[in-house]
Amino acid sequence: MTYQRLSLGRWGEDIAAGYLRRQGMKILDRNIRTPVGELDIVARHKRMLIFVEVKTRRGISHGYPQEAVGAAKQRQILRAAQWYLAERRLDRLQPRFDVIAVRRRGDEAEVEHFPGAFDVDGW
């Protein structure tokens, strides 16, 4: 991954974390690497544990950011979330899976939040 792309991704995650804090959520972890994949942001709001996938783009020529979270990516996030819950012993909290799309327009950010962007059958 190029430095420029990594830098854009980090910028988007910083924007998303700030947005979540302003919504009253507590950021528990960021960029967690698990044996089964990475989690961008883990936040808590009341009795809910929110796993947030952040997608950042400069424009829409490669599609809208949220479109990059397909079925395979959802499965990877689910496996990583299961690992996180077991490792941290937080299984009493209700999980939710969100996507935050960040589009960079010059120095400005456009944030779109999709709470409960995908559901997990049988959770």
From Swiss-Prot:
InterPro entries (alphabetical): Restrct_endonuc-II-like, tRNA_endonuc-like_dom_sf, UPF0102_YraN-like
GO molecular function list: nucleic acid binding
HAMAP family listed in its UniProt record: UPF0102
Membership in a protein family: Belongs to the UPF0102 family.
UniProt-recorded name of the protein: UPF0102 protein Pcar_2217
Biological source species: Syntrophotalea carbinolica (strain DSM 2380 / NBRC 103641 / GraBd1)
